Amino acid sequence: MKNVIRPSYNLYINGRWVPSSDGSTFKSINPANGEVLSICAEATQDDVNAAVRAAQAAFPAWKNVSPRKRQDILLKIADIIEKHADTLALIETLDNGKPIRETKNVDIPAAADHFRYFAGVVRSEDGRASTLDDHTLSLVIHEPIGVVGQIIPWNFPFLMAAWKLAPALAAGCTIILKPSSTTSLSVLELMHLLEGVLPDGVVNVITGKGSRSGQYILDHPDIQKLAFTGSTEIGRDVYKAAQEKLIPATLELGGKSANIFFDDCDWDMAMDGAQLGILFNQGQVCCAGSRIFVQKGIYDKFVAELAERFNRVKVGLPWLEDTQMGAQIDGRQVEKILSYIEIGKQEGARLVCGGEKVTTDGLDKGNFIKPTIFADVTNDMRIAQEEIFGPVVCILPFERENEVIAMANDSEYGLGGAVWTRDINRALRIAKGVETGRMWVNTYNALPAGAPFGGYKLSGIGRETDKTTMRHYMQTKNIFINLSEKPSGLYE
């Protein structure tokens, strides 16, 4: 199983695999058992400089590649991902800890589809021509912004790489991509598979700690745009770096999303949606439905049945096909989650199920936590306001529409949310009333290409997964044409 992973990975700069300039490396660890999976190069300032120079050199030719040719390349990338989907899914599972059923059925297919989607978008890009008066013509065109720095998180490394790479390549930008040092392997393996597909220097992948190699990207004077997915705390640093250089940044950050259930909801779908909202990827999802609001008429029944379902969830080794929930990313994340569980107890919330590590059935060496429910939570509790980033959900009762809208909006975040009801008018009222960038109706965690995704408030700036995303990697130029043959007359 482990033989799908290379024993070591270097940096990918200018179409070549090169070691760190000072020989630095770090280990990639399997979160399910603590075993070392591979050794990766740790990028230095010199390495980032080399990557930027390669991207700069590649940009003039790449930006002038025809939309048809860029489309062909994006489609070829999608084909390669699909051809090697099983290998990539297993690498992602081993490196990240998420169940193989998720990487096979969600992460890898969705990544391929994002390249196909933006292959279509690149051929539909157009400008605008306007006649301003009888002798003036205005042309509006969109040009690639240049060299971009992209930093992606550990929770969806392969899919987030697709979210970032596909629109930037479609726009004609060249890229320095940095995956998380915790989960670099699937992205590095992708670059091995793509050798010869992209011109040298168009995509450069550097690896290492965010505080080191990531900071070098933020500070580099020749990077013309930043794109980041991760915590709100680090997002602030990214935004400050962009402001300092007066360059644009797109940020997809944290969340504390509201999953709202009315008493007329479809019961089986609602139960499934409550689980999917918080247990998918072990709850390590920025838009996780970590605050569940339940109308009082069904509250007790809802809590009891959801607890039964949580207790039946198969927590296990992520590479086994019957595992429903895998390992948290590392020991530090486990300690953070457990500390919030203790906070919830101290705040007076009722612990209904879970609340501890799983150490049985051969899981004692990994980072496994039982699915956890807190009931009778109030919205001012820390567990209801702060992002836990794990399989811990708070359940709060409500009676009226305006009450639950106010409670849902009582948060500094605004990334995701959902409403479950058979009343479409009510669904639309709730969806419009909740201050969030994505509101699902009778579903959760659907993140397809073609639907814009991004946050309100402290959950981010800009949108992903939509044709408008490509515009984030472009700048607008106006060509102003005077058709008159008469001088202005101002200086006669």
Per-region residue spans from a language model:
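Hydrophobic face of amphipathic alpha-helices that form TPR/SEL1-like repeat modules
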Residues: 1-32
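Rossmann-like NAD(P) dinucleotide-binding subdomain of oxidoreductase/dehydrogenase enzymes
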Residues: 126-269, 398
